[in-house]
Amino acid sequence: MSKAMEKRRAARKLALQALYQWRVAGASISQIEAEFAVDNDLQQVDRDLFKAVLYGVPSSVSELDALLQPFVDRKLTDVDPVELSLIRMGAFELRSRIEVPYRVVINEAVELAKQFGGTDGHKFVNSVLDKLAPQLRQAEVAAAKSKKK
C-alpha cells in the first residue's frame, strides 16, 4: 500500500471516529476538529480528505440520508451509529469525490465496518453502498460490469 493510500485510510478512520463523536455526543464539528488536531498526529493523515468528510457529511446529512433511506430496511435513526456514520461517509464520497473509484469507497467503508462495526455490520454497509453506487456513479458502475462479461 502506498503512503498516499495509507494516509487516506487513516483519514477515513479518523473521520469515522469524529462523525461518531458528532452523532453521539453532539459536539460541534469545529470543536471535534480541534480536539482531533491535538489528540492525533495529523501528519500521518490526508488532511484534505479528513476535513472534506468531517465537514461534508454533517453539512449535507439530510441529502445523504435521503439517498440512503431507500436502501435501508429500517429508519436511519435505528441504524447502529458506527454503521450509519460509515454509510453516510460512503454516500458522501460516492457523490462528492468522483476521483475516488466507487469500489475503493465501498471497500474502505467495509474494512472500517469490520474494524469498528457490529458482527455483521460490514455486510450491511456493503449492501447499502453497493445498491447506492449505481445511482450516483451510473457510468462507472456500468463500465465495471461490462468489463466483467
From Swiss-Prot:
Example of a GO MF term: RNA binding
Residue runs in coiled coils: none
UniProt keyword annotation of Membrane present: no
GO BP terms, alphabetized: DNA-templated transcription termination; transcription antitermination
Gene Ontology, cellular component aspect: cytosol
InterPro entries: NusB-like_sf (IPR035926), NusB_fam (IPR011605), NusB_RsmB_TIM44 (IPR006027)
Cysteine disulfide links: none
Keyword check for Flavoprotein: no
Pfam families: NusB
Origin: domain of life: Bacteria
PANTHER family referenced in this protein's UniProt entry, alphabetically: ANTITERMINATION NUSB DOMAIN-CONTAINING PROTEIN, N UTILIZATION SUBSTANCE PROTEIN B-RELATED
Functional summary from the UniProt entry: Involved in transcription antitermination. Required for transcription of ribosomal RNA (rRNA) genes. Binds specifically to the boxA antiterminator sequence of the ribosomal RNA (rrn) operons.
Similarity section: Belongs to the NusB family.
NCBIfam families: nusB (TIGR01951)
Protein name per UniProt: Transcription antitermination protein NusB
